[in-house]
Amino acid sequence: MKIIGIDPGLRNMGWGVIAVEGPRLRHLDNGIVHSEAGDLGPRLAALYRGLCAVIVRHAPDAAAVEQTFVNKDALGTLKLGQARGIALLAPAEAGLEIGEYAPNAVKKAVVGVGHAAKEQIQHMVRFMLPGVEFAGPDAADALAVAICHAHHLQGRALRIKASA
């Protein structure tokens, strides 16, 4: 199974694709879809086209998107929410199952604690996906989201197996 993790952002939308082979995880690719400064509509369109191209190229079986948090900058939060809408729309249009995870849930799944620093997350992603080179911090976060979803799916499969 291939999973694409997405870290929504208006300037940089990180993505990472992993393969889940039983209990093993394998890095396939990661990158960042960029949007240039300017009017919001064209920026969102660029993010959408870029993310759709990644989904077509890698043909994942499932997607995972990090949930956003509200901060003091209401306008910034609103714009980030619109970018998150793109992060949900592109895989939904491709017919993918989408998991959504809070940042603390991603950190807990990857590091073991919900308030881990970015450096700790990147260290554990490198440990879980040996040889990975990050296209940037947003791509590293996206891989962490994909790993979180893989763990969720593996746990769900075990629960189904146990109840059968």
UniProtKB/Swiss-Prot annotation:
Transmembrane segments: none annotated. GO terms for molecular function: crossover junction DNA endonuclease activity; DNA binding; magnesium ion binding. Mg(2+) 2 binds at residue 66. Its cofactor is Mg(2+). Its EC number is 3.1.21.10. CDD domains: RuvC. InterPro entries: RNaseH-like_sf (IPR012337), RNaseH_sf (IPR036397), X-over_junc_endoDNase_Mg_BS (IPR020563), X-over_junc_endoDNase_RuvC (IPR002176). Pfam families: RuvC. It catalyses: Endonucleolytic cleavage at a junction such as a reciprocal single-stranded crossover between two homologous DNA duplexes (Holliday junction). GO terms for biological process: DNA recombination; DNA repair. The active site is at 7, 66, 138. The keyword DNA damage applies. GO terms for cellular component: cytoplasm; Holliday junction resolvase complex. Binds 2 Mg(2+) ion per subunit. It is found in: Cytoplasm. Mg(2+) 1 binds at residues 7, 138. Keywords: Cytoplasm, DNA damage, DNA recombination, DNA repair, DNA-binding, Endonuclease, Hydrolase, Magnesium, Metal-binding, Nuclease. Homodimer which binds Holliday junction (HJ) DNA. The HJ becomes 2-fold symmetrical on binding to RuvC with unstacked arms; it has a different conformation from HJ DNA in complex with RuvA. In the full resolvosome a probable DNA-RuvA(4)-RuvB(12)-RuvC(2) complex forms which resolves the HJ. The RuvA-RuvB-RuvC complex processes Holliday junction (HJ) DNA during genetic recombination and DNA repair. Endonuclease that resolves HJ intermediates. Cleaves cruciform DNA by making single-stranded nicks across the HJ at symmetrical positions within the homologous arms, yielding a 5'-phosphate and a 3'-hydroxyl group; requires a central core of homology in the junction. The consensus cleavage sequence is 5'-(A/T)TT(C/G)-3'. Cleavage occurs on the 3'-side of the TT dinucleotide at the point of strand exchange. Belongs to the RuvC family. HAMAP family: RuvC. This is Crossover junction endodeoxyribonuclease RuvC. It comes from Paracoccus denitrificans (strain Pd 1222). The gene is ruvC.
